[in-house]
Amino acid sequence: MSRYRGPRLKKIRRLGALPGLTRKTPKSGSNLKKKFHSGKKEQYRIRLQEKQKLRFHYGLTERQLLRYVHIAGKAKRSTGQVLLQLLEMRLDNILFRLGMAATIPGARQLVNHRHILVNGRIVNIPSFRCKPRDIITTKDNQRSQSLVQNSIASSDPGKLPKHLTIDTLEYKGLVNKILDRKWVGLKINELLVVEY
């Protein structure tokens, strides 16, 4: 299954707030969940919705998500927590968290178009796994810096997680450590994703 490129508001209406997918929010009067789906939720449906939330928020394919679950399952710590740490340490997600991109798909595009450097080297793979003490910068050319400058200006500096720091004048971000569970910007029960 390929990456989702369809209407984003449909997914938000169905699954709830997904800040990584888009900044838009549905109208408060149009609550389609209650209209179509009343009654008892089955366990399978609950687990499927949690998995879909994770997939659409981080912009993953089904195969990528299964690979991350497999890697997290081999770890000795809690599988759900390791899964979220793996997903949060992706380069496209870190750019989104730093405020260098408005959404995760926007961050993917920045990385794919070779505007981003990690430790002084161009990285064009959005799923690149960042480590603590990685320095993320933009290229020195004007076009790359203007793209990031617009996003930084419109982002909220109070929402920056504790495991990241940003220098807005030099367009430079730093990964301090691996994040804690409480700083994940998505309301999700990761254990249901692992069970699915």
UniProtKB/Swiss-Prot annotation:
The keyword Ribosomal protein applies. Residues 16-36 are annotated as: Disordered. Coiled coil: none annotated. It holds the Pfam family S4. One of its GO terms (biological process) is translation. Residues 89-169 form the S4 RNA-binding domain. PROSITE patterns: RIBOSOMAL_S4 (PS00632), S4 (PS50889). InterPro entries: Ribosomal_uS4 (IPR022801), Ribosomal_uS4_bac-type (IPR005709), Ribosomal_uS4_CS (IPR018079), Ribosomal_uS4_N (IPR001912), S4_RNA-bd (IPR002942), S4_RNA-bd_sf (IPR036986). GO terms for molecular function: rRNA binding; structural constituent of ribosome. GO terms for cellular component: chloroplast; small ribosomal subunit. It is found in: Plastid, Chloroplast. Part of the 30S ribosomal subunit. Contacts protein S5. The interaction surface between S4 and S5 is involved in control of translational fidelity. Belongs to the universal ribosomal protein uS4 family. One of the primary rRNA binding proteins, it binds directly to 16S rRNA where it nucleates assembly of the body of the 30S subunit. With S5 and S12 plays an important role in translational accuracy. This is Small ribosomal subunit protein uS4c. The lineage of its organism: Eukaryota, Viridiplantae, Streptophyta, Embryophyta, Tracheophyta.
